[in-house]
Amino acid sequence: MEKFEEISEKHKSRQQYFVYPLLFQEFLYAFAHDYGLNDSEPVEIVSCNNKKFSSLLVKRLIIRMYQQNFWINSVNHPNQDRLLDYKNFFYSEFFSQILSEGFSIVVEIPFSLRESFCPKEKEIPKFQNLRSIHSIFSFLEDKFLHLHYLSHIEIPYPIHLEILVQLLQYHIQDVPSLHLLRFFLNYNSNWNSFITSIKSFFLLKKENKRLFRFLYNSYVSEYEFFLLFLRKQSSCLPLASSGGFLERIHFSRKMEHFGIMDPGFFRKTLWFFMDPLMHYVRYQGKAILASKGTLFLKKKWKWYLVNFCQYSFSFWTQPRRIHLNQLANSCFDFLGYLSSVPKSPLLVRNQMLENSFLIDTRMIKFDTIVPATLLIGSLSKAQFCTGSGHPISKPIWTELSDWDILDRFGQICKNLFHYHSGSSKKRTLYRLKYILRLSCARTLARKHKSTVRTFMQRLGSVFLEEFFTEEDPVFSLMFTKTTLFYFRGSHSERIWYLDIIRINGLVNPRN
């Protein structure tokens, strides 16, 4: 407990930053515009980043912000036309977007400055592909010893927007910046009501993607801070650097530092939940918590999480958002995998002097399986095969050149193998590869008005085989099982590529 309070005091001593004056600097908005153009994530919305940057309009915006009545009228009249320019909708939209993008950069500055206080020995290599959603690999590779139950947690929605501002007060004591944050939240949503659905919550993401990431990241960091604090005390972590791979779906940066709670509330419950075998991971607005103990202890955890949300966020989390499942019978959809936890027997031969004996040890570990039915259904909707998995031609692509057809089929196959490289059983992937290969051949044969056999004899199956198995070198982590006969490409080999930033479209067509 003393260590936790010491960390809290250190965080509080680094929070005196005043960044509000930067909003009156022209270079800030140019930087925000360039950041949007260089963003490596797919463009999901139409924002000011898709418009031509105008330094003249930025100067006009800064001049208007210097006016005393600018912010007063904005608060009293939160309509978009009255906010910035009621005569010209383009000016109004441009001002709103560029100002919110600039403000997003401003509020991130205190967090960036605080990273300079981190000890050098704890620095993590800055690989460009550490943003991968497969940063959950450390959880999937954990050995679950003496664990019987999993807690599936849905991170609570809705939240009141004022809670977001209050959470940032721990890190940003620049009062004008906090007031401006309230202004943006008031402008982008209905301030006097709760956000009652995920669709409404992501309205803020549609308006300003970067600001949404920052606010959501801060909120979730506070939500899981106490869990990560307990997890760091564990002596059973599989990787020393696993703390650096905290899962962040579609976030531009990973954050190691978390907000501070009331130590008095923590002291009363910390003793009951000190567990050196805690396993925690978050993905797609959900989280999984696994630790040793009985069903009674898991129910205690469930009600503790409910009370924690009510105490820390002034928000009542419905108990039905936390599901308790027995580990042996747990099978769930996990980032495009069907994950289960089978008990694998392991025979170990021990020998003492002249006597030898066998020890039967059962290891508990996540088994990641490719969902064959789901993927075949997705290929069927995309008109690559029938509902039963029989390959068919794709007539809409027959107007393309032969190279474009091969390239499209090849990219789909590569993406499937690349994304599901962490699967422990890859036979389903080879079945999907067969479907795509034959569908490609049927499409080319239909284009040239010949049979598949004739076309394959003329083109050669070797070229197709090499084309579909070509793989670009990327940074990856491999966790292989100990076998007497090992070769690359084994069905039991699990490779976690660290350049995957979103879910494959065939796995989750909605994302």
From Swiss-Prot:
Keywords: Chloroplast, mRNA processing, Plastid, RNA-binding, tRNA processing. GO terms for biological process: mRNA processing; RNA splicing; tRNA processing. GO terms for molecular function: RNA binding. Its main location: plastid. InterPro entries: Domain_X (IPR024937), Maturase_MatK (IPR002866), Maturase_MatK_N (IPR024942). Signal peptide: none annotated. The keyword Cell membrane does not apply. GO terms for cellular component: chloroplast. It is found in: Plastid, Chloroplast. The keyword Transmembrane helix does not apply. Belongs to the intron maturase 2 family. MatK subfamily. Usually encoded in the trnK tRNA gene intron. Probably assists in splicing its own and other chloroplast group II introns. This is Maturase K. The gene is matK.
